[in-house]
Amino acid sequence: MYTVVRVGSTTLADDVSDAIVRMLTEFGVSSPGPGVRNPHFVNGELCTSSDWVLHRDAIIAFLRRWSAAGCDHIYAELDIEFDVAVYPEDRSGLLAKCLCVDNALIGELHQTHSNIMISVYNDVDENE
């Protein structure tokens, strides 16, 4: 099982994109080099979409840093099938909690946190 992190924004400014690359590099993935937009890393190798595949501990650290920077929003595909968007107004440690989700917690978060959007991905192939 692996986890995908998708960072999205309607407009991804150059400095924000560069900051993302620096953060990801700190967490042990390869730098995509200058001019590459929305880099995608699978097991440390650069791909072409706007997702990152990282180990869970790296994701927790990355999401905390991203949220603390006050960026637009975070998408974290958890255990392949759950997509959770965590907005900057919630910085109370919920990010780490979301990385340990199960079905009951998904329902609880959806009911109690209006800034959490959850959708189910059924078409993600773990072998891709």
Where in this protein do the model-derived segments appear?
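Acidic (Asp/Glu-rich) sequence patches and key acidic residues
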Residues: 1-128
